[in-house]
From Swiss-Prot:
Belongs to the steroid 5-alpha reductase family. It catalyses: a 3-oxo-5alpha-steroid + NADP(+) = a 3-oxo-Delta(4)-steroid + NADPH + H(+); 17beta-hydroxy-5alpha-androstan-3-one + NADP(+) = testosterone + NADPH + H(+); 5alpha-pregnane-3,20-dione + NADP(+) = progesterone + NADPH + H(+). Optimally active at acidic pHs. This is 3-oxo-5-alpha-steroid 4-dehydrogenase 2. It comes from Rattus norvegicus (Rat).
Length: 254
């Protein structure tokens, strides 16, 4: 049975992402994991960080790869398939590499359930749009939006992976102490890992040039931007010798 594109769920999902991002800005609070776990109410169950990250990121990978598997196989298929492969690559890393290497604190079960629901919904939205709704001209591969967007995606993913590596090296296995991250973009901002992922999804939005992708990029900017802001405050309060010239998210600006 051939699946056709229905714009209503695509627009509804995109509007939901944009609304969630706006609510994050209005509430002005960070998500309660990692450095901000102390804000979680007592009695809330926790999951080991590695298990939580693996299970919550897995749906986006499974959904995107599952939809790709049903498409005709070729080295360079329709642009939508190639773009969905980039989306899948991000979640492959998050699911099978990042989750196994992370040394983070236990993850609140409530936040885990929310993150899992988000990954299911967003994975379905992005994959459904790119496979069944997206229409690109034959010359899209040479369009500046595609080429620059893919460049930003790869650049952002590289920054994110390198920054995560830097953070892991600050802590020996079993340690729960915090140290000042240095090197790379941490020279300029406290949330280098967040900045990398924001750049990544802005690049994805440019390359896809779609409402769902821009909605996802907006949500990412709001969510990770808020995390970066509170991470910066955390470092300033904890370390008296924290670099005063370092910003929260955007070098020299914010």
């Amino acid at each position: 049975m051939q699946i056709v594109c229905h714009q209503v769920p695509v627009l509804a999902g995109s509007a939901t992402l944009a609304t969630m991002g706006t609510l994050i800005l209005c509430l002005g609070k960070p998500a309660s994991y990692g450095k901000h776990t102390e804000s979680v109410s007592s009695g809330v169950p926790f999951l080991p960080a590695r298990i939580a990250w693996f299970l919550q990121e897995l749906p986006s990978f499974v959904v995107s790869v599952g939809m790709l598997a049903w498409q005709p196989r070729s080295l360079f298929g329709p642009p939508g398939n190639v773009l969905l492969a980039l989306f899948s690559a991000h979640y492959f890393h998050r699911t099978f590499i990042y989750s196994l290497l992370t040394r983070g604190r236990p993850f609140p079960a409530v936040l885990f359930l929310r993150a899992t629901a988000f990954c299911i919904g967003n994975g379905l939205l992005q994959a459904y749009y790119l496979v069944y709704c997206a229409e690109y001209p034959e010359e899209w591969y040479t369009d500046v939006r595609f080429s620059f967007g893919v460049f930003l995606f790869i650049l952002g993913m590289g920054i994110n992976i390198h920054s995560d590596y830097t953070l892991r090296q600050l802590r020996k296995p079993g340690e729960v102490i915090y140290r000042i991250p240095r090197g790379g973009l941490f020279t300029y901002v406290s949330g280098a890992n967040f900045l990398g992922e924001i750049i990544e999804w802005i690049g994805y939005a440019l390359a896809t040039w779609s409402v769902p992708a821009f909605a996802f990029a907006f949500f990412t900017l709001c969510f990770l931007g808020m995390q970066a802001f509170y991470h910066h405050r955390f470092y300033l309060k904890m370390f008296k010798d924290y670099p005063k010239s370092r910003k929260a998210l955007i070098p020299f600006i914010f």
